[in-house]
Amino acid sequence: MPSFPRTVMLLGSGELGKEVAIAAQRLGCRVIACDRYAGAPAMQVADVAEVLPMTDADALLEVVRRHQPDVVIPEIEALAVHALAELEQEGITVIPTARATAVTMNRDRIRDLAAGELNLRTARFAYASSAEELKAVAEPLGWPVVVKPVMSSSGKGQSVVDCADDLPKAWEAAMAGARGTSTQVIVEEFLHFDLEITLLTIRQRNGETLFCAPIGHEQEGGDYQCSWQPAQLTDQQLHQAQAMAKTVTDNLGGAGLFGVEFFLCDDEVIFSELSPRPHDTGLVTLISQNLSEFELHLRAVLGLPIPAITAADAAASRVILAQTNMDSVAFEGVEQALTEADTQVLLFGKPTARPGRRMGVALARGVDRKEAQAKADRAAACVSVIPGSTAG
């Protein structure tokens, strides 16, 4: 009998899922990759690929029951999450838990948990279910405010609003970017923060919680552009962030890696969001740590030891984005991007492109953050996404 689960099913097969699949296969696991479109990145390295509408509960239940995996690892947010609870009741392990997946895919549920039940410090916020209600709740928060759909991903539908006249446009953007049938937004005070960080938090099956060195990152339109590790925090800030991350992940339960996001404002640490899975800003750990966030996730999921997490003095990442729509893709400039030492380029293998779609990432190590970020930026700037051949 195997000493740990051997069949892993990924619900979502993007670039993060691809790295999870690679980490799983290096541990001898069989990987089944599921997504809504064929040829998704993780499918390219999986043992089995399944294409299905991921928000269709019946389709999701059918594919899981047919394969009977040892563990199901959700890797995206656009899922029929209520089906996961049904699978858990049937004895299938959902990572970290079905409840954690459901709570964190809804900004209102995770915010109510963090601010209300767990009493974590967050930005002041309110909810609105119409353009008229949005105007009523935004004014007391003061300008500017941030408007987001309660259900969306990768910054879709988010906007910063400077005055009441711009709220109707923000409402329309939120509805256009919302996932599923949600018609509610969360509106938050705009925080003039010093730094935005991700604290990768690992819950092990033995009950122990581990932390990676904090990762600083910059976003544009709610989508990650670059990250670096370690981010510079005071001892007090780090202690606050770790305490809050442990509080919320203990409540969500299960085993695995969580990406817990915080704002740093002066000396205050403010909870932002949480993903119960490897985080895009954590791609930097592929070059910065002895164990990447993907390897850590798999070790925690499978109940394997994590003796130590060590990191380089400084490492950084910069995304590689598409500029136009393309039915097939290729890349130019990779050879120039790889001329510097301690630099890597990852091209995700997405079959098509659209403006702003993340197609790859450049990673670099340096003696300090400035050097590492400059190297990653130079490498990313070398790479262009171009139309590929459509020949079969």
From Swiss-Prot:
- Pathway the protein contributes to: Purine metabolism; IMP biosynthesis via de novo pathway; N(2)-formyl-N(1)-(5-phospho-D-ribosyl)glycinamide from N(1)-(5-phospho-D-ribosyl)glycinamide (formate route): step 1/1
Question: Per UniProt, where does N(1)-(5-phospho-beta-D-ribosyl)glycinamide bind?
Answer: E15, L16, E75, D280, K350, R357, R358
What Gene Ontology terms for biological process does this UniProt record contain? 'de novo' IMP biosynthetic process
Where is Mg(2+) annotated to bind? Answer: E261, E273
Which residues belong to any copy of the ATP-grasp domain? 112-302
According to the lineage, what is the superkingdom?
Bacteria
Tell me which EC number(s) this protein carries.
6.3.1.21
Q: Which GO terms describe its cellular component?
A: cytosol
Q: Which family does it belong to?
A: Belongs to the PurK/PurT family.
By its UniProt entry, which HAMAP family does this protein fall under? PurT (MF_01643)
Q: What is this protein called?
A: Formate-dependent phosphoribosylglycinamide formyltransferase
This protein's species is: Synechococcus sp. (strain CC9605)
